[in-house]
A protein has these predicted regions:
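Amphipathic alpha-helical interface segments
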Residues: 1-99, 125-179
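Histidine-centered, metal-coordinating catalytic motifs and their short helical/loop contexts
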Residues: 97-121
Length: 179
């Protein structure tokens, strides 16, 4: 049986979210992101049906893992909009960023691949040139790409710590929060 925190979501789009609804949305999106992180990590450590024809499936799964990790972080940021949660979650985000300093660069390059593919002046990371976009390695644990390294086990642990920070807010949320 699945357990969910009981907060009524507001249905009118013209009203700002209550604190309880903001925490609920953050928590819901973080749970989704954690599932995606675990899914991508599992796929990276297993054989998949398409592997025989698509030998770079691991590359795509790593790119999806990067997106899921950044989405987890962005989902946690929602909780910082609630004053009673701001400090604990902001500290957890700071720790997440310290544990995964390469994540933003990897996400930026992956998300703005069109700029990097042509060495556009709009690139945030000028050290990343078009020739390095499809050059990297993965040893089953560590992904090396664009001069950065991402250990998928360390990334999962950092994700769990961030998720646990928001979970502590959810667990301590007043039951009669008026929502």
């Amino acid at each position: 049986m699945k357990k969910y925190i009981s907060v009524k979501l507001q249905t009118r789009n013209n009203q700002p979210l209550s604190d309880a609804a903001m925490i609920e949305r953050s928590w819901s999106l973080m749970n989704e992101s954690m599932r995606a992180i675990d899914l991508q990590r599992r796929r990276l450590r297993s054989g998949e049906p398409e592997d025989a024809e698509f030998v770079f499936r691991w590359w795509v799964d790593l790119q999806f893992l990067i997106v899921a990790l950044r989405r987890l972080r962005r989902s946690a940021e929602l909780a910082t909009r609630v004053s009673t949660a701001k400090s604990i979650v902001a500290d957890a985000i700071k720790q997440f960023d310290q544990e995964l300093p390469m994540l933003q660069k990897m996400r930026n390059v992956g998300e703005h691949i069109d700029d990097y593919a042509v060495d556009s002046e709009k690139r945030r990371h000028k050290d990343v040139e078009r020739f390095s976009l499809q050059v990297g390695s993965f040893d089953g644990t560590t992904y090396e790409w664009i001069g950065a390294r991402l250990n998928i086990d360390e990334a999962r642990l950092a994700s769990i710590h961030l998720w646990e920070a928001v979970r502590s807010v959810v667990k301590n949320w007043p039951k009669d929060s008026g929502n």
